[in-house]
Amino acid sequence: MEINRSYPCNPGNYAVMDDKVNKYIVIHYVGATGSALQNAQYFERLPSIGASAHFFVGHASEGGTIYQSVDPKDRAWHCGAKVYRHPDCRNANSIGIEMCCHKDAQGNWYFDDETVEQTVQLVKQLMAEYNVPIDNVVRHYDVTGKLCPAPLVDEFAWLLFKQRLEVPAMGEKTGDNPSSWAVDHTEWAKAKGIIYGDGQGNYDWQGPVTREAMAAMLHNFAIAYGLEKED
């Protein structure tokens, strides 16, 4: 994963640490319509803002570019408060990720799909690097009660986001044995010629499905049921 580190945060906006242990990853939204680049440059340029984040994840228009503002080994000021909802998550033991956002005509905040996908991949990388369990990926809302990140304060939206963290990243090894509930379905798909393996008996049943793989499966389905002739 490419991360742009060209705009380090002004030293006046975070605290250097020697022994930080990252136990949590905290998800935020920027709360304005600026780009990740603009945010990274803002925190680089101005001292004494009293706030910071480790990463900014950009809009689709900037390719979902990720900017590292503060090194995860240092303490960014992203979830501090006088009163906390969370019993343990603090600036001193967490990594803060800010997602860039948009506001619609009704005043509702939302994320580009690419911003969400890039955030998911970044979180998964950080989870692996710092051994952070999925239960310790939290919202700013969970830590302090602040309505942040606004598009993910809704519990169902947050559940969907968390579920994406459980899907193996592209290139990650996955189990080739289907889940017990799916055995009949997978055997049927193999028998009908809808899903093909790699020629060595491997089907990667629990791997992620790309759009091109889905297109191939639909095409095979059409051929298997005579909806289209095989070339």
Language-model features and meaning:
Residues M1-P8, Y14-D19, I25, D88, ...:
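Basic/polar, cationic surfaces and motifs that engage anionic cell-wall
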Residues M1-R90:
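N-terminal catalytic cores of peptidoglycan-degrading enzymes
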Residues K20, S48, R90, N108-V116, ...:
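Solvent-exposed, acidic/flexible segments
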Residues V30, C100-H102, Q200:
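Short strand-loop junctions, especially beta-strand C-caps/beta-turns
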Residues T33, F43-L46, G58, P72, ...:
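Structured segments of extracytoplasmic/periplasmic soluble domains
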Residues A92-S94, Q200:
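Short, solvent-exposed beta-strand edge segments and adjacent coil->beta transition regions
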